[in-house]
């Protein structure tokens, strides 16, 4: 499945840009930014119309695609293919499980848990998609929906992309780029216009997905600063300033690279996030949290199939578009970024280890997070009677977490730490995204010049600022759902491609095993077999056969070793 074209060239000192990918991607981004900033009001109105159209027309496709992704990765993991390594059979993981999970956690969730951990359960409780609001059933439904939105489904999206990339790159020597996932379908055409187009869509999806994250981040940072220092206003100007300042921090991290910058920030994120969760668990309604965690998990698992295919087809509500489709679309648009990033850090793990690690561990952590923060908020409303929290969250989603912390001990200190955590998540998302986009725009090259990484980190900030000016969260929602559509199609094709590749590898393994078992040199006994074994041992190939093997196999393998050693420094 490999070819001489597939090995990424060693990056030169000035540029590793792949022009047919870089230029179209930058052109689309520049046109979008110019069009948005030249007339923000008109752009905002257009985004709203597009969002309505996409929701009504393609909602069914998004839901079906995500269901297929989930079934596919689970089926592959628990099949006989689950023992296949993402790399040579002798490869070992490069990172410890803790460091690996920390980077998974920071890249895959980032600001989402902090932004929606309190806000989403409260909003669903006060305005559920089904049934009356402000009831016990509404509270149960709110937590079930939150679990569904951030559970197995979104990690299946990341898992499919990451698994496909890691398999084709590390197992078969193809570039660590989205185009490689289509090799079993289109073959060598991945090196031409079709492959370039796939990577362009991957860049655009990643760019708008990260821009959405940055937009949500600065909104929550602004709310936190206003909460701590009321003289700081909540407006777009402050949020743009925050984007500029924190993009500068992200640039410093991205210059440091994966092992130094991203890994250290990811570990810091995980420590701060777990510390914050344990604090709220300890000082909040601990027993209530434990009870609701068990009940919510059971409710989620028992209703997962119905939720997966629910589109509210018999109602005229826009709830599904504003919530489920937005979150799934946001996740799909993030998939090239998160998938490529987790593929980079997962070399040497088996397919089963990869799928279980990517899907199960983060999902359990998510359920714990929403139970701690979401159920603490619901307890505050339903038991303690602080119903004003509903109005505060509805007025400004970004302030939800800080309003919850207001009713816990050490409010100012914990709120300040929360702002720091949001900033570090912001920086991690930006610098990880910059590394991934830069690799995609370079045809899969992993070691690129500093100026390219700086360029993409800066571009992410500009796009986020432009979308904020054009209508805030609504514009961000539209950009993510729109960019997710073509990439969802690419992901379905990639799943078919990987399935075909695994079937071929399985057939080769069976064939090799049968040959070894039937070989005259096998462990069989009987009259005359020793003569066959001896003849096999002294049956040396002719000189021309040896020279052909060296030319076609030996030189190519040594060239790959040379490239790998050069990239590793």
List each model region and its residues.
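Terminal cytosolic tails of multi-pass membrane transporters
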Residues: 2-16, 78-88, 358, 370-407, ...
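Helix-loop-helix connectors at the membrane interface of multi-pass transporters/channels
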Residues: 2-13, 175-193, 217-241, 273-276, ...
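Hydrophobic alpha-helical segments of multi-pass membrane transport proteins
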Residues: 28, 61-77, 273-284, 365-375, ...
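N-terminal alpha-helical transmembrane segments of multi-pass membrane transport
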Residues: 2-138
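Flexible loop linkers connecting adjacent transmembrane helices
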Residues: 4-13, 45-51, 78-97, 122-145, ...
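Helix-loop-helix module between adjacent transmembrane segments
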Residues: 12-23, 27-37, 70-75, 109-113, ...
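Membrane-water interface regions at transmembrane-helix termini and the short interhelical loops
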Residues: 7-14, 39-54, 73-94, 142-149, ...
């Amino acid at each position: 499945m490999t070819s001489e074209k597939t090995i990424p060239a060693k990056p030169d000192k000035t540029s590793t840009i792949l022009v047919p990918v870089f230029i179209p991607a930058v052109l689309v981004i520049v046109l979008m930014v110019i069009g948005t900033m030249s007339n923000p009001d008109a752009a905002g109105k257009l985004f709203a119309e597009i969002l309505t159209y996409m929701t009504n027309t393609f909602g069914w496709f998004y839901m079906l695609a995500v269901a297929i992704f989930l079934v596919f990765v689970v089926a592959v993991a628990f099949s006989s293919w689950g023992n296949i390594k993402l790399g040579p059979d002798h490869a070992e993981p490069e990172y410890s499980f803790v460091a690996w999970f920390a980077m998974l956690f920071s890249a895959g969730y980032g600001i989402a848990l902090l932004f929606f951990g309190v806000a989403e359960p409260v909003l669903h409780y006060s305005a559920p998609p089904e049934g009356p609001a402000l009831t016990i059933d509404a509270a149960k439904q709110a937590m079930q929906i939150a679990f569904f939105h951030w559970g197995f489904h979104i990690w299946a999206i990341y898992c499919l992309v990451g698994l496909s990339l890691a398999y084709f790159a590390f197992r078969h020597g193809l570039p660590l780029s989205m185009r490689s996932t289509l090799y079993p379908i289109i073959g060598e055409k991945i090196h031409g216009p079709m492959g370039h187009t796939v990577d362009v869509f991957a860049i655009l999806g990643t760019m708008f997905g990260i821009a959405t994250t940055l937009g949500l981040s600065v909104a929550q940072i602004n709310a936190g600063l206003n909460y701590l220092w009321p003289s700081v206003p909540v407006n777009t100007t402050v949020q743009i300033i925050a984007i500029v300042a924190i993009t500068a921090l992200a640039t410093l991290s991205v210059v440091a690279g994966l092992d130094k910058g991203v890994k250290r920030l990811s570990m810091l994120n995980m420590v701060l996030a777990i510390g914050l969760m344990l604090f709220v668990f300890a000082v909040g309604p601990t027993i209530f949290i434990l009870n609701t965690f068990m009940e919510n998990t059971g409710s989620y698992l028992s209703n997962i199939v119905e939720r997966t295919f629910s589109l509210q087809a018999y109602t005229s509500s826009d709830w599904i578009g504003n919530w489920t489709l937005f979150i799934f679309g946001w996740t799909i648009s993030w998939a090239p970024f998160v998938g490529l990033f987790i593929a980079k850090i997962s070399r040497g793990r088996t397919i089963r280890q990869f799928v279980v690690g990517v899907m199960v561990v983060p999902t359990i952590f998510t359920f714990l997070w929403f139970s701690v923060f979401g159920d603490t908020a619901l307890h505050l409303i339903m038991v303690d009677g602080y119903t004003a929290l509903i109005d505060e969250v509805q007025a400004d989603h970004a302030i939800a977490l800080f309003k919850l912390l207001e009713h816990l001990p050490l409010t100012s200190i914990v709120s300040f730490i929360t702002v720091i955590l949001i900033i570090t998540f912001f920086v991690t998302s930006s610098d990880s995204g910059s590394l991934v986009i830069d690799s995609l725009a370079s045809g899969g090259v992993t070691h690129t010049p500093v100026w390219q990484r700086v360029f993409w980190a800066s571009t992410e900030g500009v796009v986020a600022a432009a979308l904020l000016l054009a209508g805030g969260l609504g514009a961000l929602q539209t950009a993510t759902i729109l960019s997710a559509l073509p990439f969802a199609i690419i992901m379905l094709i990639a799943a078919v491609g990987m399935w075909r590749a695994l079937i071929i590898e399985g057939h080769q393994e069976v064939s090799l095993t049968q040959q070894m078992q039937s070989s005259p040199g096998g462990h069989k006994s009987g009259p005359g077999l020793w003569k066959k074994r001896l003849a096999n041992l002294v049956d040396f190939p002719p000189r021309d056969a040896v020279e052909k093997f060296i030319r076609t196999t030996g030189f190519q393998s040594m060239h790959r070793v040379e490239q790998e050693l050069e990239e590793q420094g």
